[in-house]
Curated annotation (Swiss-Prot):
Keywords: ATP-binding, Ligase, Nucleotide-binding, Protein biosynthesis
InterPro entries: Asp/Glu-ADT_sf_sub_c, GatC
Family: Belongs to the GatC family.
GO biological process, one term: glutaminyl-tRNAGln biosynthesis via transamidation
Pfam name, any one: GatC
Entries under Gene3D superfamilies matching the protein: Glu-tRNAGln amidotransferase C subunit, N-terminal domain (1.10.20.60)
Native organism: Nitrobacter hamburgensis (strain DSM 10229 / NCIMB 13809 / X14)
HAMAP family in UniProt: GatC (MF_00122)
Enzyme Commission number: 6.3.5.-
MF (Gene Ontology): asparaginyl-tRNA synthase (glutamine-hydrolyzing) activity; ATP binding; glutaminyl-tRNA synthase (glutamine-hydrolyzing) activity
Protein name: Aspartyl/glutamyl-tRNA(Asn/Gln) amidotransferase subunit C
Function per UniProt: Allows the formation of correctly charged Asn-tRNA(Asn) or Gln-tRNA(Gln) through the transamidation of misacylated Asp-tRNA(Asn) or Glu-tRNA(Gln) in organisms which lack either or both of asparaginyl-tRNA or glutaminyl-tRNA synthetases. The reaction takes place in the presence of glutamine and ATP through an activated phospho-Asp-tRNA(Asn) or phospho-Glu-tRNA(Gln).
Self-association and partners: Heterotrimer of A, B and C subunits.
Length: 95
């Protein structure tokens, strides 16, 4: 796949980048070099290779997933002006 001058101008327009006519050939060469490198990467055989999330192998720290109320429910409900059985009571707003 090669990039022509019209494609360079279209990419510049989509990216909202001002490109002079003198810059188009240089950018065309740069984009073609990038695409050539991507095509070269596609030729690499990666069958059986595990995908990596990092260059350095790391294991995620795991913790027990324990459900709790935080132990401060009484303090939270205590901030409300009116409560009933650990529920906030608010004025009725819809008739």
């Amino acid at each position: 796949m090669t990039v022509d001058a019209a494609t360079v101008r279209r990419i510049a327009h989509l990216a909202r980048i001002a490109v002079d006519d003198a810059e188009v050939p240089h950018l065309q060469g740069e984009l073609n070099a990038i695409l050539a490198f991507v095509e070269q990467l596609q030729e690499v055989n990666v069958d059986g290779v595990e995908p990596m999330t990092s260059v350095m192998p790391m294991e995620m720290k795991k913790r027990a997933d324990v459900v709790n109320d935080g132990g401060i429910a009484d303090k939270i409900v205590g901030n409300a002006p009116v409560t009933d059985d650990h529920f906030f009571l608010v004025p009725k707003v819809v008739e």
